C-alpha cells in the first residue's frame, strides 16, 4: 500500500512532441509495464485505442488515435535489454502486432507467472486485490475506448492496469526463483513474444461458437449460417461489433422458429426494433427462406470453425 500512496497524476501523451520526449526516456530504462485498451466490444475493425506505460516513477497513457507516428516504440518492444511487463500479454501483443507491426523480446507475463506459482485467481483485479489490497472498478472494463474525450475516471482505471505491475513482477520473480520455476517461466515468456497478429475474420460456415447451434437440425443450421453472413456484412459496413447488430441468442431464436411473416417475426424475443419492420424485417424473412430452401450438408460438421470473432451479447444496441 506504500506504493499506492505515492501515486502521482497520470501523464496523458496526446502529441507527437510529447511522445518523442517520452520515447527518449523509455529507451534508457531496464523495465516497463505495458497494457492496452481496445474497442473490440464496439467496432468490427478492432483497434488499440490506448497504450498504458508505467515506469518506476510515472504512469503514462499514450493515445494512439492522436499520436501519428508510434514507430519508435518498436525499438523499445524489440530491445532484449528492456523488459516489458504485461498481465496476460498474448492479447495485447497480438493487437500491437496487428495495428503497428511491432516485434517483441524480453517479456514478463504476470498472469503466466501467477499460474505457474499456483495462484487460483488469475484475473488482474483478483491479483491486485490479493497482493496490494487494491480494488479495480470494473465499470470501465468494456467501455468504448475509441471515444474521445476520455474522462478522468477512465484515465484512473486505465493507469491502474499497469501501475502495480512492476512491484508485482518483483514479488513474482522471487516466488519463481524460490520454486525453481524461473527457467520454465522464461521459456513461456519467450513463447508469448511469438504470438501472431490476429485479424478479425468471418468464416462463413462457422456457427459453433453460438451456444445451442449444435442442437439445431440441418435446415435450421443453414438458416443460422445465412443470418450470420448477413450480420457480418452489416457489421463490416457499419464498423460495429457483430453482436451489437444482432445478438447470438436472437440469431438462434430466428433459426429455431423461422418466422414466415412480419407478425411472427415481431414475436421474436430480443429482436431490435430496426429489424421488426420495413426493409430490414423483409430482408430477415427473405434470408430465412433462403437458408431453409438451401441447406448445405457440407458445412453441417460439428467441427466447424467459429462464426463470430466478437464477444456474444444478448442485448444488441439498436
Regions found by a protein language model. Give the residues of each.
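N-terminal accessory regions of nucleic-acid-interacting proteins
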Residues: 1-32, 36
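Single-stranded nucleic-acid-binding OB-fold domains
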Residues: 38-45
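Helix N-cap/beta->alpha junction signal
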Residues: 15, 88-89, 247
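Accessory DNA-binding and partner-docking regions appended to nucleic-acid-acting proteins
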Residues: 152, 172-318
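Non-catalytic, usually N-terminal nucleic-acid engagement modules in DNA/RNA processing proteins
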Residues: 33, 42, 50-53
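Active-site-proximal helix-loop-helix substrate-binding element of RNase H-like nuclease domains
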Residues: 52, 57-166, 170-173, 193-197
Amino acid at each position: 500500500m506504500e506504493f499506492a500512496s505515492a501515486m502521482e497524476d497520470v501523464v496523458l501523451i496526446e502529441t507527437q512532441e510529447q511522445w518523442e520526449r517520452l520515447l527518449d526516456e523509455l529507451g534508457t530504462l531496464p523495465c516497463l509495464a505495458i497494457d492496452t485498451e481496445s474497442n473490440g466490444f464496439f467496432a468490427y475493425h478492432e483497434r488499440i485505442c490506448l497504450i498504458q506505460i508505467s515506469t518506476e516513477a510515472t504512469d503514462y497513457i499514450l493515445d494512439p488515435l492522436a499520436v501519428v507516428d508510434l514507430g519508435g516504440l518498436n525499438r523499445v518492444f524489440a530491445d532484449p535489454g528492456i523488459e516489458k511487463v504485461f498481465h496476460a500479454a498474448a492479447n495485447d501483443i497480438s493487437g500491437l502486432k496487428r495495428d503497428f507491426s511491432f516485434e517483441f523480446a524480453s517479456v514478463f507475463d504476470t498472469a503466466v507467472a501467477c499460474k505457474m506459482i499456483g495462484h487460483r485467481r488469475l484475473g488482474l483485479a483478483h491479483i491486485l486485490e490479493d497482493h496490494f489490497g487494491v480494488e479495480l472498478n470494473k465499470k470501465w472494463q468494456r467501455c468504448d475506448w475509441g471515444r474521445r474525450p476520455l474522462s478522468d475516471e477512465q484515465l484512473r482505471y486505465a493507469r491502474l492496469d499497469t501501475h502495480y505491475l512492476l512491484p508485482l513482477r518483483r514479488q513474482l520473480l522471487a516466488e519463481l526463483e524460490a520454486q525453481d520455476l524461473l527457467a520454465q517461466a522464461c521459456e513461456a515468456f519467450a513463447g508469448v513474444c511469438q504470438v501472431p497478429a490476429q485479424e478479425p475474420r468471418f468464416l462463413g460456415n462457422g456457427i459453433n461458437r453460438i451456444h445451442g447451434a449444435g442442437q439445431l437440425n440441418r435446415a435450421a443450421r443453414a438458416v443460422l449460417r445465412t443470418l450470420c453472413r448477413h450480420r457480418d456484412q452489416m457489421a463490416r459496413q457499419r464498423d460495429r461489433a457483430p453482436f451489437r447488430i444482432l445478438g447470438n441468442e436472437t440469431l438462434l431464436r430466428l433459426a429455431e422458429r423461422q418466422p414466415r411473416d412480419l407478425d411472427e417475426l415481431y414475436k421474436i424475443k430480443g429482436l431490435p426494433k430496426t429489424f421488426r419492420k420495413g426493409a430490414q424485417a423483409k430482408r430477415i424473412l427473405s434470408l430465412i427462406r433462403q437458408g431453409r430452401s438451401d441447406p448445405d450438408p457440407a458445412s453441417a460438421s460439428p467441427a466447424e470453425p467459429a462464426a463470430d470473432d466478437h464477444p456474444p451479447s444478448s442485448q444488441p444496441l439498436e
